[in-house]
């Protein structure tokens, strides 16, 4: 059964995803098979509207520095970052901590 998650883009990061903050996403993986690395790649390929904006989100194969990543309201660094196994019902929040002035 595919994994259903919620993805939120905050801190102005929603501009890369058609200015939509909340997304319901179905990952094409079985539960226990998808790591955050696969989820982030899927999100970049399917939610980022303009391919030119992918570097705003991804750098060197991972989420760009300056973007806070929360998995179910917990910093992803405490959950194993890219190695975390995504579960059905997870909420992934990406918040830009860099703002223009």
UniProtKB/Swiss-Prot annotation:
Pathway: tRNA modification; 5-methoxycarbonylmethyl-2-thiouridine-tRNA biosynthesis. InterPro entries: Beta-grasp_dom_sf, Mopterin_synth/thiamin_S_b, Urm1. GO terms for molecular function: protein homodimerization activity; protein tag activity; sulfur carrier activity. Its main location: cytoplasm. There is a cross-link at residue 101 (Glycyl lysine isopeptide (Gly-Lys) (interchain with K-? in acceptor proteins)). It is found in: Cytoplasm. C-terminal thiocarboxylation occurs in 2 steps, it is first acyl-adenylated (-COAMP) via the hesA/moeB/thiF part of UBA4, then thiocarboxylated (-COSH) via the rhodanese domain of UBA4. Acts as a sulfur carrier required for 2-thiolation of mcm(5)S(2)U at tRNA wobble positions of cytosolic tRNA(Lys), tRNA(Glu) and tRNA(Gln). Serves as sulfur donor in tRNA 2-thiolation reaction by being thiocarboxylated (-COSH) at its C-terminus by the MOCS3 homolog UBA4. The sulfur is then transferred to tRNA to form 2-thiolation of mcm(5)S(2)U. Prior mcm(5) tRNA modification by the elongator complex is required for 2-thiolation. Also acts as a ubiquitin-like protein (UBL) that is covalently conjugated via an isopeptide bond to lysine residues of target proteins such as AHP1. This is Ubiquitin-related modifier 1. It comes from Lodderomyces elongisporus (strain ATCC 11503 / CBS 2605 / JCM 1781 / NBRC 1676 / NRRL YB-4239) (Yeast). The gene is URM1.
């Amino acid at each position: 059964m595919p994994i259903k998650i919620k993805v939120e883009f905050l801190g102005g990061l929603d501009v890369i995803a058609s200015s939509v903050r909340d997304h319901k996403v179905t990952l094409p993986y079985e539960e226990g098979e998808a790591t955050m690395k696969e989820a982030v790649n899927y999100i970049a390929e399917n939610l980022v509207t303009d391919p030119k904006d992918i570097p705003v989100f991804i750098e060197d194969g991972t989420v760009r520095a300056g973007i806070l990543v929360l998995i179910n309201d917990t910093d992803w660094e405490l959950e194993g970052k890219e190695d975390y196994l995504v579960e059905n019902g997870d909420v992934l929040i990406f918040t830009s901590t860099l703002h223009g002035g």
